[in-house]
UniProtKB/Swiss-Prot annotation:
Pfam families: Kinase-PPPase. This is Putative pyruvate, phosphate dikinase regulatory protein. GO terms for molecular function: ADP binding; ATP binding; phosphotransferase activity, phosphate group as acceptor; protein serine/threonine kinase activity. The keyword DNA repair does not apply. Disulfide bonds: none annotated. It catalyses: N(tele)-phospho-L-histidyl/L-threonyl-[pyruvate, phosphate dikinase] + ADP = N(tele)-phospho-L-histidyl/O-phospho-L-threonyl-[pyruvate, phosphate dikinase] + AMP + H(+); N(tele)-phospho-L-histidyl/O-phospho-L-threonyl-[pyruvate, phosphate dikinase] + phosphate + H(+) = N(tele)-phospho-L-histidyl/L-threonyl-[pyruvate, phosphate dikinase] + diphosphate. Its EC number is 2.7.11.32, 2.7.4.27. Bifunctional serine/threonine kinase and phosphorylase involved in the regulation of the pyruvate, phosphate dikinase (PPDK) by catalyzing its phosphorylation/dephosphorylation. It comes from the Bacteria. It is an enzyme of class 2 (transferase). NCBIfam families: PRK05339.1. ADP binds at G153, V154, S155, R156, T157, S158, K159, S160.
Amino acid sequence: MNASVVLNLHLISDSTCETVAAVAKSALEHFRSIEVNEFVWSFINSCEQIDKIMSLIEHDKYNFIMYTMFDDDIRRYLKQKAEVQEIPCIPVLSRVIRELSCYLHVKKDPYVNTGMGLDDEYFTRIDAINYTIAHDDGQNLWDIDKADIIILGVSRTSKSPTSIYLAYRGYRVVNIPLVNSINLSVDLSSMKNKLIVGLTIDIDRLIEIRKTRLVSMRNQNNCQYVDYEHVLVEIKETKRICMQNGWPIIDVTQKSVEEIAATIIQYFNKMQH
C-alpha cells in the first residue's frame, strides 16, 4: 500500500470504542503517510448489528477491522463475517487477556467495562458534546467562532445526529438549518479555519422522510414542507450557497451517520494540512 491508497479503518466495540480507538491511534502513528478514514461502531452487542456493519463496508476499497468484543459468540461471528469478505479483523486485547489468563492460571472476569479513565481526552469530548448540543439547529450562534465544524442543510438531512456523532469524537460542531427566504444570522463567508460543509439528499427520499416526520408529529397539514417544487428550491438553494462559497457538499442519500461523519472528518483533516 502506498500513500495514494486510502484505508477505511473500522473500529468495533461492545462498549464505548475508547480502548480500540486509543490502540488504533497509537498504531497509526507509525504510518503517517497513509490516509485513513475511521468508522467507529460503538455498543455492538448483537449479530444483527454486525450484519449491518458488514453490509455497509465498500468492498472495492482497502478495509481493516480492529475490535474489542467480550461476548465470545458475537466475536466469533464478527471474525467469520470478516473472513468471508476477506477483511483483516484484529482483536486488540484478546492476546493480552489470554496470555495473562494462562500465565496466572486465572479465568477472565465474566464482565468488564472496557471504557477508559477520565483523562484529558475524555473531558475534551464532553466539552465538545455540550457545545454541540447547545448549538443544535442553529441555536446560540453568538460563539460560533469556537466551532471546529459547521454543518448546513435543509430540514431532515441528518444534521443533528451527525453533529452528535462528531462531538463524541471530540469535534465542536454547529449545525444550521437552511430555510427558504430566511437569511443566515451570521456571515459564514468570513469564518476562517472552519470546516463548513453542506448536506444534501435525493428529493424523493427527503420528501418520504418528511412525510414520515409529519405523521409522527400528527401534523400532516403542513403541505409546503413536503411540496415537491418547494423542496426542490430548498435543495437547489443549499447547493448554490455551498458552491458559491467553495464549501464541500455531501449527498447523504442512503448514507449512515457513520459514513457521513467519516467523510466530514476526511475533509477536516485535509483542511488541517
